[in-house]
Amino acid sequence: MRALLLVSLLLMSCITHAQTPEATVRDFYHFYLTDFVADNHENPLNSAKMQQYVAKETLTRLKTIQDIEEQEIVDADYFTYCQDYAAEWIPALDVGTARDDAGGKVLDVWLGIQDGKKLKLRDYLRQEDGNWKIYRVVDVSNGFEQNIFDDNAISAARAHAATLSQH
């Protein structure tokens, strides 16, 4: 009986430490934007923090695309849809309420940008290793998505890169 009670308490403590999708996204963007503006010249895709917040498949695809010479699949930062970001914009971060979506969650994110404006993104999350992780980000403000999940585009980019190395 004591063993059952101990196991129950242990399971309850694990459950209470699991983050909500909203907390995951908020924590991710606080970390990521701070790192983005620091520009420490390290590849953030390799960091343990990224593995904590971003789905494995997404990180793998971003690394694959990043290694393709002159690729045109990702033309801005995938998680911000920006080329640059200013530290003074970070406090304007706002995260919406998660909604169910195809077995995962989706929520809106507003990033502060120049002139006090906001850029609206939509983050898609799924459970991985018992945690909510970001696997897809869409720029809602501009109706645009960097198609990192398009295998044909990745193959075409690789083929194009191969022709560049022949010259």
Regions picked out by a protein language model, each given a short descriptive name:
Residues 20-21, 41-42, 113, 117, ...:
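Extracytoplasmic/periplasmic, Sec-exported soluble proteins
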Residues 33-67:
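Short, solvent-exposed secondary-structure junction/capping segments
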Residues 13-15:
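N-terminal signal peptide c-region/cleavage motif recognized by signal peptidases
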Residues 101-105, 115-122, 128-129, 135-167:
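Low-complexity, intrinsically disordered terminal/linker segments enriched in charged
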